[in-house]
Amino acid sequence: MLKKTLIASIVLAVASTSALAKELTDAKFLFDVGPYGNHSWVLKGIKDRTFEKYGINLVPIGVGPGSVKTGMALAAGKADVGYQDFSGVITVNGKSETPGLKAIFVVDDRAQDGVYALKSSGIKTWDDLDGRTVGSFPTGTTRNLIPVITTAKPSYVNMPFALRVPSLVSGKVDASEGFLTTMKFNLIKSGYPDFITLQVADKLPYAISRVITVSNAWAAANPEAVDKLRKAVKELLVEHIDDPEASVRALKGPLTMGAKGMSIEIERAKFNNAVLIMTDRVKKHGLNNSSVLAPRLDKYIDVLSEKLRLPNKHAYYEYYDLD
């Protein structure tokens, strides 16, 4: 009798699991880079099944790399959900006659773009970049926003991300573009803690950074899943802000091997939370407040579309839907 009861329980459990699996909406997921400590809440949400609780089977398939390639993958249907910089959404949609993706949740309330220089360079302000060499990328967001910030005319040296820190610390360039959550920690890990950061957000307060995106095809096929995804993201972000260490523990691999690696990723997560997510605006209005964000996003779309000389400018709702 006991054996029959156990078997019945197992069958019931399997049936329940199968039923749950049938109710889940599959979503192929791309990180822009990393994943690092600031991305770790997504992995935690997969591991602790928060996404499943909201009916989403989120499956990481890799990294862009970068926000533009992440956006291109979503627009082409190679991925369904992304974690990327909003500039990538503007760029990819602006290069297409038919927009292929949109942001559904703003994670970082401030732009992560910046310019880094060693203190020994004497660079202290944006105007100090005049005539100085800056490691950059021709289509990079920061490079195209600098003319909005200052009349200074830097001498740009084209280089990939991997060469930014080596070129800066070796003196091949006076300064280098970089994201706040990557360049800062790459310099620290390389043994160069004395540097200055010129933050784009200090001059362009309307600019934002990372968002959660969905491909238009996936959203059209799964409209209810989009709202469920927003709810899962908000729940996980609130937990991550409260306890980033719990999220970072979901990271696996060489980044978090050893006490030093884990410590750096925890600090990266805390820095991202304090500087980019929990701004005074978010403390006052809450996460992903569409009425507060919409005017800022519209202006950012206008400015970046013009500065990047994008061939197509669409209605604002083609770039984001936060509700």
Region spans (language model):
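Sec-exported extracytoplasmic/periplasmic mature domains
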Residues: 47, 56, 75, 94, ...
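Secondary-structure end/capping motifs
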Residues: 221-307
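Sec-dependent N-terminal signal peptides
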Residues: 5-15
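Periplasmic-binding protein-like
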Residues: 107-117, 188, 192-219, 226, ...
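Hinge/cleft segment of the Venus flytrap/periplasmic-binding protein
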Residues: 299-323
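Sec/Tat signal peptide C-region and signal peptidase I cleavage site
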Residues: 17-21
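Short, glycine-/small- and polar/acidic-enriched structural segments
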Residues: 22-160, 166-178, 197-198, 206
